[in-house]
UniProtKB/Swiss-Prot annotation:
Matches recorded under PANTHER family: ORNITHINE CARBAMOYLTRANSFERASE (PTHR45753:SF2), ORNITHINE CARBAMOYLTRANSFERASE, MITOCHONDRIAL (PTHR45753)
Gene expressing this chain: arcB
Enzyme Commission numbers on file: 2.1.3.3
Gene source species: Burkholderia mallei (strain ATCC 23344)
SUPFAM superfamilies registered for this protein in UniProt: Aspartate/ornithine carbamoyltransferase
Protein name, entry field: Ornithine carbamoyltransferase, catabolic
GO molecular function, one term: ornithine carbamoyltransferase activity
Residues holding carbamoyl phosphate: S57, T58, R59, T60, Q84, R108, H135, P136, T137, Q138, C274, L275, R321
Function statement: Reversibly catalyzes the transfer of the carbamoyl group from carbamoyl phosphate (CP) to the N(epsilon) atom of ornithine (ORN) to produce L-citrulline.
Pathway the protein contributes to: Amino-acid degradation; L-arginine degradation via ADI pathway; carbamoyl phosphate from L-arginine: step 2/2
Length: 336
């Protein structure tokens, strides 16, 4: 079966099949090797890419900018403070304007409906840099990182996600594992599982790929024998402090600490995090939480002990954001 990623949107990974995902992963590997060896060939000369950020970012913005520059493309960073988006101009009109000036558009923001609307009206490829529901560019980086740190084929890799699984990370890790035939475990309170219809959709993908999907409220069952443990922050700066109590109390059993990671029974288990991480109280939010919950001063979703240990590969994971995003740009705009 042939496929063509030229001028394709990247909105959720739902519409990408396993062969296309593997191609992007292989291309990212090749582009990474070329960058390291100094043999990279620019394929995006004179291409222009708009980067819309309604949510702040470090890794996503830097990854898109460096990936584009490496390949000879130009980027324009657009945020709400420096544009009319949402103030005097709708996303539909913004899409129709930018689509006439740019070769592609990246969007990082809130509802999935917004990036879908952008894609519908822009007339050029649109890339989802993160929405409340999905984080597809992070998933490519995560799977690339797991491949690099395992001698197993993808079908045999086992990984768990612990924490609030209703968010973009929980949804997306379940989805990409289902697409690629992997062994995926979700460990979370049942009230924080992905939506039932989304789980059913992933189970249908798993039936085609041979993936094994497990959702459990027992964190130790979730991580038994896994090769990788993923987590994400439990609270966000936009949430009121009063809302933290219920979330933290519900998720405390799912904290990634030495006891939990050793319970895997696998001395090679690695820890992964999309970042930023509240593994200590050196940040504004971390300090606020530590003051309110003194027992979490050494880490919230993950302890500082685990985060600073050799098991943690979060920074390799962060670097791979750039290589996988570059693969998306090259395959979409580079004509290969």
């Amino acid at each position: 079966m042939s496929f063509n990623l030229h001028n394709r949107n990247l909105l959720s990974l739902i519409h990408h099949n396993a062969r296309e995902l593997r191609y992007l992963l292989d291309l990212a590997r090749d582009l990474k090797r070329a960058k390291y060896s100094g043999t990279e060939q620019p394929r995006l000369l004179r291409k222009n890419i708009a980067l819309i950020f309604e949510k702040t970012s470090t890794r996503t913005r830097c990854a898109f900018e460096v990936a584009a520059y490496d390949q000879g493309a130009n980027v324009t960073y657009i945020d709400p403070a420096s544009s009319q988006i949402g103030h005097k101009e709708s996303m539909r009109d913004t899409a129709r304007v930018l689509g006439r000036m740019y070769d592609a558009i990246e969007y990082r923001g809130f509802s999935q409906e917004i990036v879908e609307e952008l894609a519908h009206h822009a007339g050029v490829p649109v890339f989802n840099g993160l929405t409340d529901e999905y984080h597809p560019t992070q998933m490519l980086a995560d799977v690339m990182t797991m491949r690099e740190h395992s001698d197993k084929p993808l079908h045999d890799i086992r990984y768990a996600y612990l924490g609030d699984a209703r968010n973009n990370m929980g949804n997306s890790l379940l989805l990409i594992g289902a697409k690629l035939g992997m062994d995926v475990r979700i460990g979370a309170p049942k009230s924080l599982w992905p939506a039932a219809d989304f789980i059913a959709q992933c189970e249908a993908f798993a039936a085609e790929s041979g993936a094994r999907l497990t959702l459990t409220e027992d964190p130790y069952e979730a991580v038994k024998g896994v090769d990788f443990i993923h987590t994400d922050v439990w609270v966000s700066m936009g949430e009121p402090v009063e809302a933290w109590d219920e979330r933290i109390n519900a998720l405390l059993p799912y904290q990634v600490n030495r006891k939990l990671i050793e319970s895997t029974g696998n001395p090679r288990t690695r820890f992964m995090h999309c970042l930023p991480s509240f593994h200590n109280c050196e940040t504004k939010v971390g300090k606020q939480i530590a003051e309110r919950y003194p027992h979490l001063q050494d880490g919230i979703e993950v302890t500082d002990e685990v985060f600073e240990s050799p098991r943690c590969i979060a920074f390799e994971q962060a670097e791979n954001r750039m290589h996988t995003i570059k693969a998306v740009l090259v395959s979409t705009l580079g004509g290969i």
